[in-house]
Amino acid sequence: MNIKRILKVALYTTNASDVGQMYIVLGIVALIIGSVNAALIRDQLSFNNLNAVDYYDAVTLHGIFMIFFVVMPLSTGFANYLVPRMIGAHDLYWPKINALSFWMLVPAVILAAISPLLGAVDLGWYMYAPLSVETTVNYGLGTNLIQIALILSGLSSTLTGVNFVMTITKMKKVPYLKMPLFVWGFFTTAILMIIAMPSLTAGLVFAYLERLWGTPFFDSALGGSPVLWQQLFWFFGHPEVYILILPAMGLVSELLPKMARREIFGYTAIALSSIAIAFLSALGVWMHHMFTAIDNTLVQIVSSATTMAIAIPSGVKVLNWTATLYGGEIRYKTPTILLISFIVMFLLGGITGVFFPLVPIDYALNGTYFVVGHFHYMVYAILYALLGALFYYFPFWSGKWYNDDLGKTGAILLVAGTFLTATGMSIAGILGMPRRYAVIPSPIYDPFQFMASVGAVLTGIGLFILAGVLVHGVFRGRAVNGVDPWDNISVKLQDFFIKPVKLPLSFGKSLDGAFDEEYHGIKFPYYSVLGLFLSFIPLGFMFILIGLIPIGIVLLLAFMGVGLYWGYDQWFKPMQPPPHFYADGGVPVTNSVNNSISPSLGIASMRDARSAVLWFILAEVILFGSFIGGYAFIMSPVTNPLSYVNNIVPAVEVFPLPAIMTAILLSSSIPAHIAYEYFKKGNVKMFRNLGLLTMAMGLTFLGGQIYEFTHYIHFIPQDSAASSFFFATVSLHGFHVIMGLVIWAFMMLRIRKGFIPYAGSVAATYYWHFVDAVWVVVFSTFYLHLIV
């Protein structure tokens, strides 16, 4: 395949297999960037060649790249490549949104990579406030670019999570308890993405606004709290640990039996343990990261207990993996070494992690390199699993073999190097070496930091050999005979539900490898361009807020132009009204090419759309919960005892305008609901008329809010953290009202063109009810002050 063909496929494709391969390539590029920053860290701690600013920049980028832009894209890449093949789906549920999700991540990686060129990013991957919001140490725009990059990454991950949940629940051709274990692993990961990412997005929005606009969400002097950032971040951060490791566990569960040539031992227990891990990780485990920040014994006990409990399902997996190996005929190949090393390193990570639920020990170790060592044991284990999968599926992807002897050499060097690095860090931490220091504070730690640096060199050599083995395999590898490279059929093990017709299953190929993939009739690469241009929204507002208004407006208009052209060209231009559309109150009697879906399929699509909208609403509930919960946090003397008194409670008039507008908005759910009921009975005409009434009431509400903000509100967001939350939360709700109106307008225009919006009717109605329900909470909190 030549370069021109590769670029064309990359820009136009919506095929999950192709998108998955692009995720993997992006993850490998990010791995190189993250590794360069790791080398800078080791150089500073070994030879003191950097200044403090450059060192902390490297620490920040290394952590952010490895977590957000290496492990997550690689896991998502394997999910795109494998899940449809494993469950018999022809693609993901939303192929176009899948492509959009990938292309949103590309500018995120670019912005994060160039961020130190535009200002200091001395944050750490956890970006704690107030360091992340002040502009003296972290001067320039670098930190803003990091925040924008991670907002884009979070939105991409949320869309991906909903897409995979819908794909697995609606398109699988195998029963749940027959699904491959990797599918189970990523299914639970997708649910955690939906739950965890919105709180990080909320925190990043607060930090973005505080840096650029002076809204004091985290400023104690004005009623804010730096601990609020920790709550929001770690509510995301600990589920994120399992977002990282559950796909790796799934790959190990999937591939270990192939290498042991026997069925997995304890399939049901492993599948259910994934659910248990996901459930426990979202309960209260995140607060064990904050034992030194929370002075509440009950909270510490609950968090400690749930943290200990999560070891049980993890132990179930390890026992079953070990039993699988015990009864198998193990093939000592490159993937085998990496998969077994995963188990060993995961155990070491678990053993070092056992100390942290014990509050007194956590107090002693929390600020030391022992935490860094523990985390590296876990992340290195994840890396082994991902590389093991890469080597296992390489013959399927390329149709060629690699040099397995060299592969095993590289794998052994990688494992030895990573073990030395993580162990050196852990010993230094046990001896008390503090983390986040640019200079080693005592010579007692030198041998162990040197040990970590030697390990890093071995790790680099191992990765270099493994990369060379794969590159050599692509160009000079021996061809695979048949379509079962690992001879799994002979032991009745199955790699895919969609069996390959021929190899390779490479870029631009169909799921079975039989033919080159088409582009779904796309004449312009809308989803790649839209994904790239989405970054223009936060970038545009950034330029506006720093005073470069023309640049900001140009960026915003560029995105709007592409979006409007896409909507017209893809959704309205090709549509021709059918000759007979309505009869007897709006029942459709004939269909055009654009409306060829049968009523039975239309009803089925409505059921699917309801599930999809409810998953989106779950993410939205977490987002609004982060905003409203953040307000409750800074206003409470229990959670913000030192600075809650510095808040100025927004004095907002309830009568007459806000009360009237609230009544209008809440009443708009009535015509919306009746419209939906008419639609289900086939009366599209009444659906249209009542939908227009709903829109009119929504527009009236927005108009009333604009008038309220310009005539009734006499305070500004910068007055206090409370006023910042008022403006941020009410504006967020207003944005969602606009989104709801856009969906309704879209439905009305499609109906006018003669299209029956089966799925769209569900999306418009359910989402509008959600927007109205959220306003009840917002109005009660900020206008009636019933919650705080």
Curated annotation (Swiss-Prot):
Its EC number is 1.10.3.-. The chain crosses the membrane at residues 19-39, 58-78, 100-119, 152-169, 187-206, 232-252, 276-294, 307-326, 337-356, 369-388, 411-432, 449-468, 526-544, 547-564, 614-634, 657-676, 690-707, 729-749, 766-786. Pfam families: COX1 (PF00115), COX3 (PF00510). SoxM is probably a precursor form of subunits I and III. Keywords: Cell membrane, Copper, Electron transport, Heme, Iron, Membrane, Metal-binding, Oxidoreductase, Respiratory chain, Transmembrane, Transmembrane helix, Transport. Binds 1 copper B ion per subunit. Binds 2 heme groups per subunit. One of its GO terms (molecular function) is metal ion binding. The keyword Heme applies. One of its GO terms (cellular component) is plasma membrane. It comes from the Archaea. Gene3D superfamilies: Cytochrome c oxidase, subunit III, four-helix bundle, Cytochrome c oxidase-like, subunit I domain. There is a cross-link at H238-Y242 (1'-histidyl-3'-tyrosine (His-Tyr)). It catalyses: 2 a quinol + O2 = 2 a quinone + 2 H2O. Cu cation binds at H238, Y242, H288, H289. PANTHER family: CYTOCHROME C OXIDASE SUBUNIT 1 (PTHR10422:SF18). In the N-terminal section; belongs to the heme-copper respiratory oxidase family. This is Quinol oxidase subunit 1/3. It comes from Sulfolobus acidocaldarius (strain ATCC 33909 / DSM 639 / JCM 8929 / NBRC 15157 / NCIMB 11770). The lineage of its organism: Archaea, Thermoproteota, Thermoprotei, Sulfolobales, Sulfolobaceae.
